[in-house]
Amino acid sequence: MQRIAYIVLCLCLGAVSLWAQDKEKPALQIADNTFFDPTKKEVVEEKYQFGVEYRVEAGYVQHWQRPHDISFRDMYLHGVRLGATFTFKLPLRFGLETGLLYTLVYGRNDQHWRSMDAPSVQTEYIQHRVLEHNLTVPVRAYYTIPLWKKLNLFFYAGPQLHIGLAENDYMQLHLSEGTKNWLETQGVPTEPYDRMADELIRANIQMGLGGGLEWDCYRLQSGYDFGLNNLVKHPQAKGQYMSEWGWFVSFCYRF
């Protein structure tokens, strides 16, 4: 009898336990609403590796010779520039670029003189046709701003050194004999010559600013360079000064 009572008690306790489990509510899981949020942007850590980029460059250039207290007028020289550059990649989208560029430009202007033969006030002139060769060594700091996919906007600033190789003046004389003789006595050249040999300093230091757009391996850029030093080698009077500024637009390809 006691065994039967014990069995009945165990069955009752088991039934109560099962009933309690059925009554217990399961814990609800809260879904992450941001999982399907289209406005949520995944934070991608920008990885950067140091390196060197190599480019070739070709473009149009315009030089502006700006004389002060000299009988020459302002002269614009137009031409082409070719060369190669390499850029050291730095953190935070910065870069440092240098290289070697060759420039060939041509320009002309008229230098007027009072006639020594005419009975009245009359001017004669020398037409200067100048062909200039130089090398340029730029040192530029670049900053790049990503725009869309492989399209970037960039800006640069920095100095550059123009090394004058030659500036040949193929002049044409429109002078009377008396005016020509007088100019020769004053030391004014009346035959073709290299202005770099005696008149001008070969080193032209400039400060440049510019920028452009870059798509993958291709770059289109433009900039302006301000001449900082006097190019007159032997000033004949106080305040005699000439500087050379420049503007360019070029196309670059990265290997």
State where each predicted segment sits.
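Helix-adjacent hinge/juxtasegments
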Residues: 128-134, 141-144, 149-150
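Extracellular/periplasm-exposed beta-strand and loop segments of Gram-negative cell-envelope proteins
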Residues: 60-77, 105-135, 164-208, 230-246
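Exposed, low-structure sequence patches enriched in small/polar residues
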Residues: 23, 148-162
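Residues on the lipid-exposed face of transmembrane beta-strands in outer-membrane beta-barrel proteins
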Residues: 38-40, 56-58, 80-90, 100-102, ...
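Outer-membrane beta-barrel channels and translocator barrels
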Residues: 45, 89-93, 146-150, 216-218
